[in-house]
């Protein structure tokens, strides 16, 4: 099993303007034995080029899959929520093609592909099918609207994931840097910082050290729609 130093051991609000990271209602129990691993926030699960020896499922937390462009930019290509399977390269005895990183503290189930039976395989197939639809929606939103709209959509998407908490005023507080938002919107940190500054000046968000608070979610939704 090729993992980067792992230790053993919400539902998204419907918004037609933002890609939805819907958590499966329940995760079917695997018949194959699983090994549960715990990863801390921003800890890497595996790197590009690592041997693909296990299939994984998110038990708890939020994980992202990234790729690096020839210019050295990191792009987020996939988000994984509880119940999602990933690491399907293990079925082909290949190498990891991407980087998997825990965005929150996460519990991950590692499964030996040689022990997966037909029932487990159907569960994995259903999960990957749902993720493909989600990925298509995510890519659509990356290619429509200007950067201001894309940033607003991404913040709305992250607001109802394990990456966010609710403050005393009931507002979502997202644990995210400008760099993370840039990687999730196919942009640069400098361009995203300018948009964040504008949204803060308009009173739609508040930003602090590695955090962004959604102050006016309704108006931010309007920005995402292009109004």
Please name every model-derived segment.
Residues 42, 53-66, 82-83:
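Glycine- and acidic-residue-biased ligand/ion/polar-headgroup-sensing regions
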Residues 63-75:
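A short beta-strand-loop-beta hairpin characteristic of the jelly-roll/cupin
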Residues 45-50:
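Short phosphate-coordinating micro-motif centered on Lys-Gly-acidic
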Residues 78-133, 137:
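Cyclic-nucleotide recognition modules
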Residues 160-227:
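Phosphate-/nucleic-acid-contacting segments
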Residues 1-41, 85-86, 90-92:
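Cyclic nucleotide-binding regulatory module and flanking cytosolic helices
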Residues 121-189:
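Polybasic "coupling" helices that flank or enter modular domains
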């Amino acid at each position: 099993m090729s993992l980067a130093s792992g230790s053993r051991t919400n539902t998204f609000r419907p918004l037609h303007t933002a890609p939805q990271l819907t958590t499966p209602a329940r995760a079917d129990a695997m018949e194959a034995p699983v090994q549960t691993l715990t990863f801390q926030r921003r800890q890497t699960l595996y790197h590009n080029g690592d041997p693909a020896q296990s299939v994984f499922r998110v038990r708890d937390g939020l994980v992202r899959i990234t790729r690096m462009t020839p210019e050295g930019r990191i792009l987020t290509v996939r988000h994984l929520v509880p119940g999602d399977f990933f690491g399907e390269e293990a079925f082909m005895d290949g190498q990891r093609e991407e980087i998997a990183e825990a965005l929150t503290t996460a519990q991950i189930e590692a499964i030996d592909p040689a022990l997966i039976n037909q029932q487990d395989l159907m569960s994995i197939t259903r999960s990957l099918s749902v993720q493909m639809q989600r990925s298509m929606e995510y890519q659509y939103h990356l290619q429509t609207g200007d950067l201001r709209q894309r940033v607003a959509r991404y913040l709305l998407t992250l607001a109802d994931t394990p990456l966010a908490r609710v403050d005393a005023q009931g507002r979502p507080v997202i644990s995210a840097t400008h760099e993370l938002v840039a990687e999730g919107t196919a942009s640069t940190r400098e361009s995203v910082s300018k948009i964040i500054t504008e949204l803060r000046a308009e009173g739609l968000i508040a930003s602090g050290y590695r955090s962004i608070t959604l102050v006016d979610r309704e108006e931010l939704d309007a920005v995402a729609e292009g109004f």
